Amino acid sequence: MSDHDSGNARRGRASFGAFVRKPVERGAPAGAAAEQGGLDAVQALPDDAVEVGAVVDAYGLKGWVKVATHADAGRGGDALLSARRWWLEKGTQRFSARIVQSKTHGDTVVAQPAGVGDRDAALALRGFRVFVRREDFPALAADEFYWVDLIGLDVVNEQSATLGKVVGMIDNGAHSIMRVEYPSVGKDGRPAAAERLIPFVGVYVKTVDQAARRIVVDWEADY
């Protein structure tokens, strides 16, 4: 069993929906991007939009942008490569952009949004966060999962004891680990949240039922 940023989780370092954002430059003043053609202003992002990266620079002279992906390019970056439409957001500015071409470039993804015709127009997009719709993610094999789809699932053991809810994922380089949060009591006697870490590997994870929003594990509550 494996989970994915996009591709095998053992290769990726960050996740869609559970990532550490990379720092990005502030970029052009607010409103500069809106002055260029080719981008459609929108009031809101799609309901299934997932943040997958941020525009960090222009690429070349012909309107291409360079995106630092929240998951490794070619792995988590696969969603950027497969989606033909991106959504961009910075502050109160939101745009929909049709992507003409995209490809990996080192550890980034570079792309040509329609209507962004030169380097200055591309530079105006620095600092915009990039989203794609979950439905545009590449399909995975039956035993593979995107981290964003695991966040929020309930975790129970084989004796039906409730262990908590997945609130995040960690990649330790060898495999992924679920951060499972559950209610507890703090040192002051007040209700508090506690966390247990469960490796997301086949020896412990028995079933993942996304429809039922439940993960069954071979794990005891007192581990």
UniProtKB/Swiss-Prot annotation:
Binds ribosomal protein uS19. GO terms for biological process: ribosomal small subunit biogenesis; rRNA processing. This is Ribosome maturation factor RimM. It is found in: Cytoplasm. Belongs to the RimM family. HAMAP family: Ribosome_mat_RimM. An accessory protein needed during the final step in the assembly of 30S ribosomal subunit, possibly for assembly of the head region. Essential for efficient processing of 16S rRNA. May be needed both before and after RbfA during the maturation of 16S rRNA. It has affinity for free ribosomal 30S subunits but not for 70S ribosomes. Disulfide bonds: none annotated. PANTHER family: RIBOSOME MATURATION FACTOR RIMM. InterPro entries: PRC_barrel-like_sf, PRC_RimM, RimM, RimM_N, RimM_N_sf, Transl_B-barrel_sf. The keyword Chaperone applies. Gene3D superfamilies: PRC-barrel domain, RimM. One of its GO terms (cellular component) is ribosome. SUPFAM superfamilies: PRC-barrel domain, Translation proteins. One of its GO terms (molecular function) is ribosome binding. Pfam families: PRC_RimM, RimM. The PRC barrel domain binds ribosomal protein uS19. Residues 142-223 form the PRC barrel domain. Its main location: cytoplasm. The keyword Chaperone applies. Keywords: Chaperone, Cytoplasm, Ribosome biogenesis, rRNA processing.
